[in-house]
Amino acid sequence: MQRVNVGHKALADYNSLIGRALAEEIRALAEPLKGRRMLHLSATAFGGGVAEIQYTLIPLMIDAGIDAEWRVIQGQEEFYDVTKTIHNALQGDERGLTDGQRAIFDGYNKLNADSLADADEWDVIVVHDPQPAAIPEFVQTTRPRWVWRCHIDLSTPNPDVLDFLAPRLRAYDACIFHMPTYVPHGAGLNEAVIWPPAIDPLAPKNMALAPDDAAYIVDQFGVDVSRPLMLQVSRFDPWKDPLGVIDAYREVKRVHPGMQLALVGSMAHDDPEGWEYWNRTQDYCNEDPDIFMFSNLNNVGAVEVNAFQVQAAVCIQKSIREGFGLTVSEALWKSRPTIGGRVGGIVAQISDGETGYLVNSPEECAKRTLDILADPGATRDMTRRAKEHVRRKFLMPRLLRDWLALMHRMAGETTVELEVVAGD
């Protein structure tokens, strides 16, 4: 395994954004935990929301007095091919696992478990998502409490793949899910804890950026900043439905011929299908000069994503399945009018008609885009409400508070406030 260097962050820098009550609660929770040790394990250090969260969460935990560390597991392409199949199946894909794929999954998990020689030196070990989920089965130690943090939608999983994973999940003292509907019934979990993820308002991706600066950055990529822009920021993945976004854009363009579309994504090494779907999306664009596709490999990093979101007339997350979709909160925090698919965690972030719009089809997405463009006054009111909603519920200090509360619970202190669902 490889340790990830996360740098330094200070909780005090967030106080003006979160208010006194939450800041004081965090301090009170952190004080008796000083010196406790928490290790996080995940599949990748870049590309995707899990890694983004870790780059802020881990240094904030350290600032709060926790001895926290983040490591990335090792794996080859055959392993990530299998874990992508598992990921898709847990979100409803009908394809199951062969005996060979099951052996590959367990084999790489054992390989990583064997490299975890210091497991008994940690108070809590957190495993993120399915890729490393079997590691506790292969670690011979009784000291750490094991926690599985699930970042995907498990509301309608492939039953065969869930049956394969469930015995491995029963090795955990607690499993954390974004929403109650994601807790898999019949899996026999010891305990399920519910909390949503969060964004870092001070990270380069979300820091305040003047409109002129955003326009300058976007202009460098060949986008005409004098014309309106529809934007989706997401991985290139069928669950994110970039083809549906293109369909919506084409409908809008019939009314607003100057409309442009940018699809911006990050290509992660644990997502072998990403390039295949990139190519499929590119073909679907049909060489339209007003459709742009960018990734981290086009030098689109955190600041550039920020600029595209600030510049966009409408931000879209038209997922058809979605673990949570933090790009929604990112756009809402920037006071951008936002449209999301009526699925998963997007519904927790958008109150339809109040803080944004929820849609079920490309046609609805196009209609709501036209509504936004037609009524700037109502749109401004909606975006103000949306920013305040994100401030209350989806900023990183609230997530830190939840992790500190869980550490108390793992130490046997059950009086801390957490949403807990009994395992079944």
Residue ranges with predicted function:
Residues L39, V218-K240, L261-A262:
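Conserved donor-binding/catalytic core segment of Leloir-type glycosyltransferases
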Residues G186, V343-G353, Y357-V359:
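Short acidic/histidine- and often glycine-rich active-site loop of Leloir-type glycosyltransferases
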Residues G265-A307:
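Nucleotide-activated donor-binding/catalytic signature segment of Leloir-type glycosyltransferases, i.e.
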Residues I320:
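Aromatic "clamp/platform" in nucleotide-sugar-dependent glycosyltransferases that forms part
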Residues G325-V328, I346:
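Short glycine/serine-rich donor-binding loops of glycosyltransferases
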Residues V328, P337-G340, I350:
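Short hydrophobic beta-strand element within catalytic cores of glycosyltransferases
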Residues D352-E363, D371-P376:
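Conserved acidic donor-binding segment of nucleotide-sugar-dependent glycosyltransferases
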Residues A378-K393, L399, A405:
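A short, well-ordered alpha-helix in the C-terminal region of glycosyltransferases
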